[in-house]
Amino acid sequence: MKRLYGVIGNPIGHSLSPVMHNDAFEHLKMDAHYHAFLVKEEVLGEAVRGLKALGISGFNVTTPHKVAIMDYLDEIDPLAKQIGAVNTVVHKDGKLIGYNTDGIGFVRALQSISSEPLQEKRILLLGAGGASRAIYFSLADAGVKEIDVANRTVDKAKELIAACTATVHSVALSLEKATKEQGNYDIIIQTTTIGMHPRVEHTPLQISSLKKGTIVSDIIYNPFETKILCEAKEQGAIIQNGIDMFVYQGALAFEMWTGCVPNIERMKQLVIRKLGG
């Protein structure tokens, strides 16, 4: 019997997840289908109960349901609980279990371009929103010991740092101070929407004095190269856009659902083609 997977969100028509997962199913000769479900906020509970009743094997959760979904699940993974958001649900033994693969997916994506263990790196996170929180907690969970957080509102950065129970040395910075101290970091991670299409001329941090070999990663992938990545490349940095995070978090969800590891490079090239790259 064909297994059913999917993604719920609103809007959902733009999602690249169905293309990516269905290609992986076909490539691995698996009898499965991944579908995008438009689910409005006021019917989220009914939709989740309906998916469970239909016997869906697993599904992703995107905007605006990542927090609200937690009220309708049977179990939540400890890391997802700490992050406060779920983006992947596994249906196992009659239970819906929530996970967060965003942060772990990002960590795996970052490791894929780093020649050295991340645990030894000094990291600067730009932003203190939901994406930053997932990445911060996942980096801490992976054993990274130095993670500073820069945000327009410094108090929000302080709140993010205070919420983490892991042993991490962290300082909350203003964006102005982070700009001055950018040369002290091995990795800079841009987690805000600043620089996303159509406001491509904006950047949260003017890149001017990076040290050699710095990695600059931006979770945005439209455009492929944001202003911060362009400036970092001019400084000789190793750059990474958000496609890697999207692919790795999806691949991790696929692995959780099926027990099979998909071809990451195949997934990545498919997404790039679909985005017109």
Curated annotation (Swiss-Prot):
InterPro entries named in the record: Aminoacid_DH-like_N_sf, NAD(P)-bd_dom_sf, SDH_C, Shikimate_DH, Shikimate_DH-bd_N, Shikimate_DH_fam, Shikm_DH/Glu-tRNA_Rdtase
- Tell me the active site: 66 (proton acceptor)
Q: List the keywords (alphabetical).
A: Amino-acid biosynthesis, Aromatic amino acid biosynthesis, NADP, Oxidoreductase
Which GO terms fall under biological process for this protein?
amino acid biosynthetic process; aromatic amino acid family biosynthetic process; chorismate biosynthetic process; shikimate metabolic process
Enzyme class of the recorded protein, top EC level = oxidoreductase
List, alphabetically, the GO terms of the cellular component aspect: cytosol
Residues at which shikimate binds: 15-17, 62, 87, 102, 221
* Keyword S-adenosyl-L-methionine attached: no
Keyword field contains Oxidoreductase: yes
SUPFAM superfamilies, per database record:
Aminoacid dehydrogenase-like, N-terminal domain, NAD(P)-binding Rossmann-fold domains
Q: Its domain of life?
A: Bacteria
Pathway listed: Metabolic intermediate biosynthesis; chorismate biosynthesis; chorismate from D-erythrose 4-phosphate and phosphoenolpyruvate: step 4/7
Q: What is its EC number?
A: 1.1.1.25
What quaternary structure, including any partners, is listed in this protein's UniProt entry?
Homodimer.
What family is it from?
A: Belongs to the shikimate dehydrogenase family.
Query: Would you tell me the protein name for this molecule?
Result: Shikimate dehydrogenase (NADP(+))
Primary gene name: aroE
